Amino acid sequence: MKNKIFLIGMPGCGKSTIGEIIAKELMLKFIDMDICIEEKTSKTISELFEQGEDYFRDIESETCKEIIKYDNVVIATGGGVVKKDINIETLKNNGLVIFIDRPVEKIISDIDVSRRPLLKNGKERIIGLYKERYDIYKKACHKIVVNGSTIDEVVGEIKKIIINN
């Protein structure tokens, strides 16, 4: 079993919720990268984005380098972590990267856009991001798991992947 599991995917695909459950069930530590960034900077993700997306992405890259030092951990990354090739390389070279692929219609029906700075323009923005990032997520991962059913089924599928790697 790999001792670092990185969950990637669109905002609202279930990375944090699923990651927490998997970590608990496999007795691993859980880290939400966005929370790490907020604690490190004493600012919310939205406040950081107000200083520009490039500014935020630089902090995200620094955080990527820092979190790979942890062992026996499940890490829910930020949805845009794959926008920088250096982050993809860092994640892929240091653990098992799983893309949680959730149908965009389900993301739209569930997501709270007020907490997601890049999604505040609503449905069209989410669809645009999905189209922009989908192939990048596929390239950035070792395994793809579709989150189109229940959380229990997705958790079970990811746990099998983790245990068999």
From Swiss-Prot:
ATP binds at residues 12-17, 116. Keywords: Amino-acid biosynthesis, Aromatic amino acid biosynthesis, ATP-binding, Cytoplasm, Kinase, Magnesium, Metal-binding, Nucleotide-binding, Transferase. It is found in: Cytoplasm. One of its GO terms (biological process) is chorismate biosynthetic process. Its EC number is 2.7.1.71. Binds 1 Mg(2+) ion per subunit. It catalyses: shikimate + ATP = 3-phosphoshikimate + ADP + H(+). It holds the Pfam family SKI. Belongs to the shikimate kinase family. Catalyzes the specific phosphorylation of the 3-hydroxyl group of shikimic acid using ATP as a cosubstrate. Monomer. PANTHER family: SHIKIMATE KINASE (PTHR21087), SHIKIMATE KINASE 1, CHLOROPLASTIC (PTHR21087:SF16). This is Shikimate kinase. It comes from Clostridium botulinum (strain Eklund 17B / Type B).
